[in-house]
Amino acid sequence: MYNYFLFMTNFGADTPFILLAKITVKEDKVSEYLELADKTDKAVEAVAPGMLHHTFDQDPENPLVFVWSEAYKNDEAFIAHLANPAVGKYLQEHPKLADDFTVEVYGTVGDKCLEVMKGTGVPFKVFQSKLGYSRL
């Protein structure tokens, strides 16, 4: 059922993590944003084997708020994700279509991954793992 079962006592660059990116789209730009998100999602699915989960979810109370929920196999998978040209285009187009973009990472990531995150210019917060396990 699972590719591997990992009890995590040491968290770091080789362990899975979850990323939630919350976006508030401009009122008159929702359909354009959904088109951009759809193109990006398809491009990610085609070339990112380390991306274990990738959905674009709409807030049930505010139709302008969306959340990318993503699960990564490890830091290398995230760094490869950001190197995808479609993701670069998405990050360039985002400010034209949305007012807000914040990222929360759940899990421990290495220094290289943190530097790559900082390089996006997107505000982010990392919640470092202290205990637990992953079946991703």
What are these regions (language model features)?
Residues 1-7:
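Short, Lys/Arg-enriched N-terminal segments with co-localized hydrophobic residues
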Residues 37, 41:
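Short amphipathic alpha-helical/adjacent loop interface patches that line ligand
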Residues 7-12, 54-58:
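Short beta-strand/turn micro-motifs at beta-sheet edges
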Residues 12, 43-52, 71-128:
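An amphipathic, aromatic/His-enriched active-site/gating alpha helix that lines ligand/cofactor pockets
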Residues 119, 135-136:
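Long, compositionally biased terminal regions
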